[in-house]
A protein has these predicted regions:
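A contiguous, low-structure linker/loop signature
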Residues: 74-114
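Glycine-rich, N-terminal phosphate-binding loop and its surrounding beta-alpha-beta segment
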Residues: 55-87
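Active-site loop segments of alpha/beta catalytic cores
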Residues: 1-36, 40-45, 55, 66-70, ...
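Ser/Thr/Asn(+Pro)-rich, low-complexity disordered segments
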Residues: 47-49
């Protein structure tokens, strides 16, 4: 296997500056996986920023990954919405159980965004970013939601989808509250770190084609997405990114309307066809993805290698570059040899120089 010609820091600095690099970058998204490998409890990984950061850094270095540690508390915004995360796992990292703050229509009608002083998730994001800064990591991510997905952290999804059909005005009311949360959070992060150090990321799991039809996506969620991006741009934010979680192949034409700035970062779930995404959204973005999660857990290194090479061949010559990544957050029970297979594919088939 060929060795790297650049360090990860050199590679990513050149990559984001549009300069030539040695090979396709490899980001593992190894968050909870790292906590589990380093034998942290769920409580330690989710809420002890020093332990979480350092666990991720050890694993990033061990697997020769690009990218940096990040705060990963699944459904963390529930804490800011007045709900509860029930933490499980004393000797390992497990997904928390969500207790939504809204149980019924009466709760929804009377729901107000809790006072900002009680936003524990946002406080933890700031704490993590400050710790990362001490370690030499600059840049802070501000969430753009989506608003509809955040409503899914206020109320259980099955209930929400019923309300989409039967109580659309109530859903619109909750989307407005989610927008309020997004924009207030952005103001706090900008004040804390400076607009020049902030970027914007958004995630769309509740808008995928298995949950909402493209028609419903356009009607229910897209107006808020456009409003939020417009208002964030008005605040001076210039760097944007998004993750298409789930199958969004029928939504791609609609996502063009966001008109993300050239060089924006778009990561893709395995259910999105790389060639189709590139054809519809164009070459003006950085793309990342999308090695299947089940393959990383159950597949052989040879299978992961082949899937990685296939993605690299499709996207390697994209104008603004391509990053090989898992389809979503790296599964906790991923085989370490399968991460090595992704690295091997980048080194052997992703060379530029």
């Amino acid at each position: 296997m060929k060795l790297d010609r650049l360090t990860s820091e050199e590679r990513m600095k050149r990559f984001y500056s549009g300069e030539k690099i040695d090979r396709v970058p490899f980001i593992s998204s190894a968050t909870m996986y790292a906590g589990n490998l380093m034998e942290l409890s769920s409580e330690e990984f989710y809420f002890d920023v020093e332990k979480s950061y350092n666990a991720q850094k050890w694993v990033i270095d061990m697997h020769c990954c690009d990218g940096n540690p990040c705060l990963d508390i699944p459904n963390g915004e529930v804490l800011d919405f007045g709900g509860e995360l029930i933490i499980r796992g004393n000797n390992c990292v497990k997904l928390p159980i969500v207790n939504h703050p809204i149980k019924n229509i009466k709760d929804a009608v009377n729901y107000k965004l809790p006072d900002v002083k009680s936003w524990e998730f946002l406080k933890k994001k700031i704490e993590f970013a400050k710790y990362a800064s001490k370690k030499g990591i600059s840049g802070v991510s501000i969430t753009a939601g989506s608003s509809f997905t955040f409503v899914g952290s206020m109320v259980e999804m099955t209930q929400l989808l019923k309300w989409v059909r039967k109580e659309p005005e109530l859903v619109e009311y909750l989307i407005g509250i989610a927008e309020e949360y997004i924009l207030k959070s952005a103001d706090i992060m900008i004040k804390e770190f400076g607009v020049e150090n902030c970027s914007v990321s958004s995630n769309y799991p509740f808008e995928n084609n298995a949950i909402l039809s493209p028609k419903m996506f356009e009607k229910i969620s897209m107006p808020s997405i456009l409003r939020v991006h417009e208002k964030l741009r008005e605040k001076g934010l210039k760097s944007f990114g998004m993750h298409l979680c789930g199958n969004h192949n029928k939504n791609l034409e609609l996502f063009r309307d966001i008109n993300l700035e050239e060089g924006s970062f778009i990561s893709l779930d395995e259910r999105n066809d790389l060639s189709m995404v590139r054809k519809i959204l164009g070459d003006k973005y950085i793309y990342a993805g999308n090695v299947p999660s089940n393959l990383l857990v159950e597949g052989s290194p040879e299978e992961v290698y082949r899937a990685s090479v296939e993605a690299i061949k499709i996207m390697k010559d994209n104008k603004h570059g391509f990053i090989l990544m898992p389809s979503c957050d790296l599964p906790i029970n991923t085989k370490p040899t399968n991460l090595f297979a992704m690295l091997k594919a980048c080194r052997e088939e992703g060379e530029y120089i």
